[in-house]
């Protein structure tokens, strides 16, 4: 009995030691590879830089960047990506070039979805209403990066008011939302209260391990695998040909 107890204690000691080592590795990697700079979702950082006006609504959150100098025709709406920013850098660069810009958040702000899951595409109507109320005229251009580009493509096929789109690292498909999966997977976006058809994510084992260890991860393999195994790719495809 004592011998069995000693064996069990040794096993427990080994498990505890391994857990401590793993926790140390994760903490080290998290500190080493953490993103530099301010929290991209911290809207106070944008406000403190000045030269912007806060824009709020039921879901609408962001800032208006009035053009520097003589304003060019139209307005540009910009979105960030999965980091949750309003693409402040792009908005200010365009502002400097004489464009009126709306830099909007689409999740992560008070009154919005906390994570990039089930973001209502309907919120863009608030942006259109804001522009109309403030007498903005001319072409409407919408710009997005990565998941923001996926958002922009989905908006473009649903809102005829959009004249032009600019998308960086876009997707031809709507993918699964990014967030807490304990309640199950869901789409990144909804439309009129219903989830937009999406491609479920299938993460390779190597990517899963690197994520657990807080190591830098490339998600290209994840998205390629997810698309290859998608049960209905066509349903999830963004019908961008409908954008005229």
Residue ranges and their predicted role:
Residues 166-243:
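Accessory cap/linker subdomain of secreted extracellular hydrolases
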Residues 135-146:
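Alpha/beta-hydrolase fold nucleophile elbow
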Residues 149-160, 165:
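Short glycine-enriched nucleophile-adjacent loop
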Residues 72-81:
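Short beta-strand element of the alpha/beta-hydrolase
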Residues 96-111:
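Conserved alpha/beta-hydrolase
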Residues 108-137:
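Catalytic nucleophile-loop/oxyanion-hole region of alpha/beta-hydrolase
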Residues 26-71, 230-236:
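N-terminal cap/lid segment of alpha/beta-hydrolase-fold proteins
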Residues 1-20:
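N-terminal Sec-pathway targeting helices
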């Amino acid at each position: 009995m004592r011998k069995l107890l000693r064996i069990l204690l040794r096993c427990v000691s080994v498990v505890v030691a391994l857990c401590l080592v793993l926790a140390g590795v994760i903490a080290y990697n998290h500190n080493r590879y953490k993103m530099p700079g301010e929290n991209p979702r911290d809207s106070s950082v944008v406000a403190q830089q000045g030269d912007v006006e806060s824009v709020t609504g039921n879901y609408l959150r962001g800032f208006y960047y009035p053009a520097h100098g003589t304003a060019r025709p139209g307005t540009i709406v910009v979105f960030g990506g999965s980091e949750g920013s309003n693409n402040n850098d792009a908005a200010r660069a365009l502002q400097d070039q004489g464009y009126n810009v709306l830099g909007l958040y689409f999740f992560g702000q008070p009154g919005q979805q906390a994570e990039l899951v089930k973001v209502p595409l309907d919120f863009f109507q608030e942006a259109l209403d804001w522009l109309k109320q403030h007498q903005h005229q001319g072409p409407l251009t919408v710009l997005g990066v990565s998941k923001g580009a996926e958002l922009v493509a989905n908006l473009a096929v649903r809102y005829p008011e959009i004249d032009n789109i600019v998308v960086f690292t876009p997707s031809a498909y709507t993918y699964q939302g990014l967030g807490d999966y304990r309640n199950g997977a869901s789409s990144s976006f909804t439309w009129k209260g219903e989830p937009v058809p999406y491609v479920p994510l299938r993460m390779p084992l190597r990517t899963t391990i690197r994520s657990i260890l807080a190591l830098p991860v490339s998600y290209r393999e994840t998205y390629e695998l997810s698309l290859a195994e998608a049960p209905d790719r066509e349903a999830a495809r963004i019908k961008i040909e409908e954008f005229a």
